[in-house]
């Protein structure tokens, strides 16, 4: 059964372009990234704590796997904030989301983990930078927008994956029907 596993980067870029119409998003994300650079691992750990607490993933009971996941996710968050308009972070994201699809992880759980982490990131920004700064709301908005961008790409990945699954299923059913009635070779 051959099926398309990759998301077209042009589709991802189209979503990035919509969010990047605000030309201030990239500089604000870079500033957030610089402010939180020493806390990226904390953000990543908080994200993975959600998945660990579910108790559904045996591989997350292995401390080495958890450490690798936290380290990779911290690097991903840094790349996303450092170059929100770039493609590298989104390629990593689409690979991770396609893996989640193939493993049957519901989108609602992925969204919950990201949204929960978003609130934690805003809390950290307030602690590190302070809510009294004039541009705090702009920086908080950048975090929310970056998460909205990420969630949009995630939804597109899940939609594409399920469309491919349905197309594959229809082809298989059609081939089976043709075989059953003696049309196929």
Report each predicted region and the residues it spans:
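Core of compact, soluble alpha-helical bundle domains
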Residues: 1-95, 115, 122-185
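Elongated alpha-helical scaffolds
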Residues: 98-125
């Amino acid at each position: 059964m051959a099926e398309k596993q990759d998301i077209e980067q042009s589709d991802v870029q189209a979503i990035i372009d919509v969010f990047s119409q605000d030309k201030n998003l990239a500089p604000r994300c870079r500033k957030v990234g610089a402010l939180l650079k020493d806390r990226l691992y904390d953000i990543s750990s908080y994200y993975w704590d959600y998945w660990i607490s579910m108790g559904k993933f045996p591989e997350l009971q292995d401390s080495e796997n958890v450490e690798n996941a936290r380290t990779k996710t911290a690097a991903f968050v840094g790349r996303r904030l450092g170059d929100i308009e770039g493609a590298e972070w989104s390629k990593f994201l689409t690979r991770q989301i396609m893996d989640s699809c193939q493993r049957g992880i519901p989108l609602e759980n992925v969204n919950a983990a990201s949204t929960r982490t978003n609130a934690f990131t805003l809390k950290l920004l307030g602690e590190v930078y302070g809510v009294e700064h004039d541009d705090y709301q702009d920086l908080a908005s950048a975090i929310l927008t970056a998460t909205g961008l990420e969630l949009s790409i995630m939804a597109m990945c899940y939609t594409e994956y399920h469309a491919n699954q349905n197309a594959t299923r229809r082809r298989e059913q059609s081939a089976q029907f043709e075989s059953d009635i003696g049309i196929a070779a």
